[in-house]
């Protein structure tokens, strides 16, 4: 991989702003505001009977860019082919012959964000060396880019920073205010500079409290959203507190079709339930809409007006629509909101109780019944009439909409939005950086789960290529290199429709140990660069050193569906590629030892992650003891006894200081005395802030399970 300054990040381009243009922000901060409703009497909700008018119109602009970019990419990919006449047919005046591409980025915390960044960099012609040693131009040729959980941290960062590139992020990586500066965890961003950390968390608490004071329900996901935003939008005022999801449609690079359409995925949770499975309602967010194709909802709403009180899509009060509820950080955090799963896991329930107690201590009016999920209130689909008659109407009957991490249903790859017949894609690149095995490598289970979903109630009208069981994935080495699924359309005719060919690209080791724990919540510059470089190599078969023909094989995968539908002659080089990379239906179902038991949820691993993320104070001591010194009259000096009694944390578990790591520049810090005054004004003491930091360490470690 030849990312500029990949090993010498000290050579930087100064003064270049990566933030989105000024049109990307609305309102005055994180709290939503009230605005007049649209003047026309149209509903804010539509039946999910096809693509929205806005998406359809945007596609016309995007198609013009992808056609040119894809022609250039395929010309390079097939330059050594004996017969390239098919390209002339594909790029004739008939635009329907041009293949359409989607890219899906899996969840997996910072591992997925960084490893996925390397894979995306390999596909981006803005990356130095990507055209010579990678798949440069493939990203420019793609129509859709979906992200889930940690993968959405990647896609959201790129899209809402004015479609910045991984290359630009790398070029600025050693700067203290750079994007993805995660040398210190979001829990303690100042490291040894406690002043900096206190001020950061004062701001976060005040911003979330402002949303509550404005009359909107809040949950732990709001705190998570604001904390994450400092990693993703550091160049924007208050780290993008006023940045909205819908504002992207007003940014030129998106409005003109110069970038893919970003899609993020979250799972719905029925009111009064906690279990999420393949029958969960799958929600997608685009800059235009949010909603679900699933029969349990079958509706979409304009994302710009989320939070508005509606009945069957019509505002209850035409003079009072909500603006700013679709905060970009909140949507990104929604896709990574995994709190409810912790309350179900025996090994994490104690930490969850700690978090619940902490959050209610510092933020007033936190939802008591549903603080473990992302709350969208009022429910934008209240009383809508598009639910399939065979389904319960509980989602549309509820006053609020509850969403959780998009991977909780076992589909850790956001493939469903890309395989919809309405989007008519020919090939989907599935970038899997999950941690399913004992060694934190992907097992292919997310592919298996998406395949199985088409046979569930929620999978009505869905099609996905045949894939093997998880043991076969591992036993046949399908997770050791890219594998193509659905290579022959003639073998898929018994499905609902012919789905896209899926190019599965798993996380594999090349130059760096890319199988970092999902619980790892801080990466220094060297680690970040190593993860990105390894992702680049995983996506390119080691910069083509493992297979010099790999670029051509990717070209074959892209043109395959159109070649079949046109009944055109397949280049002979593609025949060999498909023999090398297509799964041929062979099964090997014997139990694989790599699946003996993933340790993600073990309490020891969580405690270890907390110790890395916070400064060295035992959690049990903090929970059980009174605070002292620098306190204010409004400070709560101890936690409730039921939390302490339920804790099974060892008093010997300490939270080690990581102050030796590089920290945010001290030039931004204020004196301790001025900070103490500010802390008193905000009713947050130094001692309580230490408690806050430690308990937020528990939050961070648990969130790391995505």
Curated annotation (Swiss-Prot):
Glycans are attached at residues 47, 80, 94, 125, 162, 181, 193, 217, 279, 309, 365, 390, 491, 515, 524, 543, 567, 584, 598, 630, 634, 642, 648, 652, 658. The keyword Membrane applies. It is a lipid-anchor; GPI-anchor. Residues 1-19 form the signal peptide. One of its GO terms (biological process) is glycerophospholipid metabolic process. It comes from the Eukaryota. It is an enzyme of class 3 (hydrolase). SUPFAM superfamilies: FabD/lysophospholipase-like. It catalyses: a 1-acyl-sn-glycero-3-phosphocholine + H2O = sn-glycerol 3-phosphocholine + a fatty acid + H(+); 1-hexadecanoyl-sn-glycero-3-phosphoethanolamine + H2O = sn-glycero-3-phosphoethanolamine + hexadecanoate + H(+); 1-hexadecanoyl-sn-glycero-3-phosphocholine + H2O = sn-glycerol 3-phosphocholine + hexadecanoate + H(+); 1-hexadecanoyl-sn-glycero-3-phospho-L-serine + H2O = sn-glycero-3-phospho-L-serine + hexadecanoate + H(+). Optimum temperature is 40 degrees Celsius. Sequentially removes both fatty acyl groups from diacylglycerophospholipids and therefore has both phospholipase A and lysophospholipase activities. However, it does not display transacylase activity. Substrate preference is phosphatidylserine > phosphatidylinositol > phosphatidylcholine > phosphatidylethanolamine. The substrate specificity is pH- and ion-dependent. In contrast with activities observed at optimum pH 3.5, the order of substrate preference at pH 5.5 is phosphatidylserine = phosphatidylethanolamine > phosphatidylcholine > phosphatidylinositol. Present with 623 molecules/cell in log phase SD medium. This is Lysophospholipase 2.
